[in-house]
Amino acid sequence: MGSLGSKNPQTKQAQVLLLGLDSAGKSTLLYKLKLAKDITTIPTIGFNVEMIELERNLSLTVWDVGGQEKMRTVWGCYCENTDGLVYVVDSTDKQRLEESQRQFEHILKNEHIKNVPVVLLANKQDMPGALTAEDITRMFKVKKLCSDRNWYVQPCCALTGEGLAQGFRKLTGFVKSHMKSRGDTLAFFKQN
């Protein structure tokens, strides 16, 4: 499904930030998407970086940053030059939803990701009692917080892979549009 890199010079590179609380399933879904197989992950201390090519002309460099409390303090350092944000929510961990929502709201205030498209992945949909994508949209105030950007909430299951491709395809479309509008803006300023 994914490849390490593209040999096609026409391929554009996009930087994607993959965030969420610890144990939300970020690394599991990244490697499920990239390798299309189950792997055992351990909590990410620091970050993982992988390139995924879902379309011939766009390669995503995905920065999977650890979600432990001490790592969240440095999330902002990874925001510069970001073309897309994927925020992963454990839809079954109702005790930490408020904390996750606060972190989501905090990262959206970072100046470097202003107008950057967002896909929320409502993970662990295979578990009983998982909140729906609609529940997550409402609880995370996505319509209000993301009114200045493209956004989408995708239900998924990192273990089975269900919903991952759809969520990342949506992100890819948003990223292309964002990069084009940013490129048009840069071209305008170079001319004037």
From Swiss-Prot:
Expressed in immature dendritic cells. InterPro entries: P-loop_NTPase, Small_GTP-bd, Small_GTPase_ARF, Small_GTPase_ARF/SAR. GO terms for molecular function: GTP binding; GTPase activity. One of its GO terms (biological process) is intracellular protein transport. It is found in: Cytoplasmic vesicle. SMART domains: ARF, RAB, SAR. Belongs to the small GTPase superfamily. Arf family. GTPase that recruits MYO1E to MHC class II-containing vesicles via the effector protein ARL14EP and hence controls the movement of these vesicles along the actin cytoskeleton in dendritic cells. This is ADP-ribosylation factor-like protein 14. It comes from Homo sapiens (Human).
